[in-house]
């Protein structure tokens, strides 16, 4: 039976694949029959992801993408790609007044500069096939709303969204598509590692019309959609996946 979302025969790079959304994307891509290349900094957790992948021909490469030399070496090792899911990033809640220069540098280095340099190197080394698809994992903080403590994180994602739209124009003549996926709150297990009470969670959930937080699979399947040929006429867009949060 024909599956319009199939990634059969496509080679897809997923960054930040050692846990959470990145792991879910990698698994989903392998289930859609892609040849998956995963990368992250943590060797043990990346191996755990690798063991969950389906199919043959998958590859794992340890690399810290915030290190420009490691990033360059990674790109040189890669075959031609049909898709990129750029997921590596960090979340930091910091009030601007008490933040330091190093905080700004680290957040932008990982959330903004690393994905930009990745695509820069892929293009310069001719690693993207014609009609390839690039998907950046951004956030609703990048396109919609501010939050106390979110000035640095939100602006790092807003910069990525701006880059994505301009890049989409630059590479359109080659049929390469560029989009972002912008999730709201996704339960990646982080609530199990915090002191947030059940009452606090229930109060926060009132901000979501669909009455739940996102699942990693919600985001992974959206990325599959944008990587697949189904979305071949979609570029330069930001896909908000937030349970209706931004409607309020």
Question: What is each stretch, according to the model?
Answer:
Residues 2-3, 224, 235-248:
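Short C-terminal tail/terminal secondary-structure segment
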Residues 18-19:
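Conserved glycine-rich cofactor-binding loop
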Residues 95-108, 204:
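Substrate-binding pocket helix/loop in short-chain dehydrogenase/reductase
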Residues 119, 156, 164:
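Active-site helix of classical SDR
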Residues 124, 165, 169-170, 232:
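Alpha-helical segment proximal to the catalytic Tyr-Lys
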Residues 139:
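Residue(s) in the substrate-gating loop at a strand-loop-helix junction
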Residues 172, 177, 234-236:
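Short, small/polar-rich loop/turn modules that mediate ligand/substrate recognition or access, typified
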């Amino acid at each position: 039976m024909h599956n319009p979302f199939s990634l059969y025969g496509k080679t897809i790079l997923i960054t930040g694949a050692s846990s959470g959304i990145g792991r879910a994307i990698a698994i989903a891509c392998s289930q859609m029959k892609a040849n998956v290349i995963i990368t992250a900094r943590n060797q043990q957790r990346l191996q755990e992801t690798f063991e969950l992948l389906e199919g043959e021909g998958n590859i794992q490469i340890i690399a810290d993408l915030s290190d420009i030399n490691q990033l360059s070496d990674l790109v040189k090792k890669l075959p031609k790609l049909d898709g990129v899911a750029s997921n590596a990033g960090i979340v930091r809640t910091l009030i601007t007044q008490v933040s330091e220069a190093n905080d700004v540098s680290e957040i932008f280095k990982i959330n903004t500069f690393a994905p930009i340099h990745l695509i820069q190197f892929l293009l310069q080394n001719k690693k993207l096939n014609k009609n390839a698809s690039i998907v950046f994992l951004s956030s609703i903080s990048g396109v919609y709303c501010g939050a106390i403590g979110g000035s640095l994180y939100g602006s790092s994602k807003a910069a990525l969204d701006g880059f994505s739209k301009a890049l989409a124009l630059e590479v359109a003549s080659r049929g390469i598509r560029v989009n972002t996926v912008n999730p709201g709150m996704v339960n990646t297990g982080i609530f199990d590692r915090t002191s947030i009470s059940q009452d606090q969670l229930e109060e926060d959930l009132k901000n979501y019309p669909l009455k739940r937080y996102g699942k990693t699979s919600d985001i992974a399947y959206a990325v599959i959609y944008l990587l697949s040929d189904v979305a071949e006429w979609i570029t330069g867009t930001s896909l908000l996946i937030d349970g209706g949060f931004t409607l309020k």
